């Protein structure tokens, strides 16, 4: 997919992919409005600074799951231990479509991830 914008990326997805990826994008927009997503590495990504090494969260769609990517491998390892229904990929957690419980668990830990990078934003949670 050669999307130039987040809305274009979402428009290129099938209905199931679009529903789940859009839900995560909506969550990030509602809880962390100061983080603006952009397309990087062909997926919607929220940079915590100006460069990727300063931290990022991203989302991507695959055939049977969607992935939420994190720049911190140790955080991802801890997170995946509590998500037995999900597989861990390279710097990402793969959530099967329809697994709302795992998605909500990941969303609940986004603020913990942001604290690793001393991100000065605050969630409305």
Task: Write out the residue ranges for each language-model feature.
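Charge-dense, helix-prone N-terminal extensions
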Residues: 1-125
